Amino acid sequence: MQSKEDFIEMRVPASAEYVSLIRLTLSGVFSRAGATYDDIEDAKIAVSEAVTNAVKHAYKENNNVGIINIYFEILEDKIKIVISDKGDSFDYETTKSKIGPYDKDENIDFLREGGLGLFLIESLMDEVTVYKEPGVTISMTKYIKKEQVRNNGERVEIS
C-alpha cells in the first residue's frame, strides 16, 4: 500500500487577527485526515499558543510586523505542524525550567506568569521540539486516531 503524504504551507503576518485563520485551516487539515474531535481541539489550542507567542514576542523590538510560517505535513498516522518566525529568540530550556509542575491545589491567582503556553503545547501534542536561531521554530506532532460515526450517531475511534 502506498503511503499518503500531503504538505500545506501558510505565510501570515505576525498579527493576532490571523490566529483564527490558522485555527480554521488546522481544523480542515485534521478533519480531512480523519482525526478525532479531541485531537483537533488539542492541536488548535497548541497551535494557537505557539502562534500567539510568536505574535507577542518574536517581533516586539521591531516596529514592522514580521511573518509567521506554518507548515502542515500530513502522514498516514500523524500530522506534523511547524511554526517558525525570524524574530527574537528565547532560551527554551530556561523558560521550560521555570514552568510547572503545577499543583492542582495551587491558587490560580499565584501561578507564575509566562511559559504556560509552552506547558500547554507539550501537554497537548505527542512530540514537541523547539529550535532557535534564527528566530524560533516549534515543531509539533500529533499522532492521529481515526474516527467514525456509527449508524446511531455515536462517534467511535478506530485504529
Swiss-Prot record:
Enzyme nomenclature, EC number: 2.7.11.1
Q: Which SUPFAM superfamilies match?
A: ATPase domain of HSP90 chaperone/DNA topoisomerase II/histidine kinase
Residues passing through the membrane, by range: none
Catalytic activity, per the record?
L-seryl-[protein] + ATP = O-phospho-L-seryl-[protein] + ADP + H(+); L-threonyl-[protein] + ATP = O-phospho-L-threonyl-[protein] + ADP + H(+)
Indicate yes or no for the key word Transferase.
Answer: yes
Task: Name the enzyme's class.
Answer: transferase
Instruction: Note the Pfam families from the entry.
Output: HATPase_c_2
Keyword Transferase listed: yes
Molecular functions (GO terms):
ATP binding; protein serine kinase activity; protein serine/threonine kinase activity; sigma factor antagonist activity
Q: Which InterPro entries match?
A: Anti-sigma-factor_SerPK, HATPase_C_sf, RsbW
Keywords from the UniProt entry = ATP-binding, Kinase, Nucleotide-binding, Serine/threonine-protein kinase, Transferase
Q: What does this protein do?
A: Negative regulator of sigma-B activity. Phosphorylates and inactivates its specific antagonist protein, RsbV. Upon phosphorylation of RsbV, RsbW is released and binds to sigma-B, thereby blocking its ability to form an RNA polymerase holoenzyme (E-sigma-B).
User: Which family does the similarity line name?
Assistant: Belongs to the anti-sigma-factor family.
Q: What is this protein called?
A: Serine-protein kinase RsbW
Gene name as annotated: rsbW
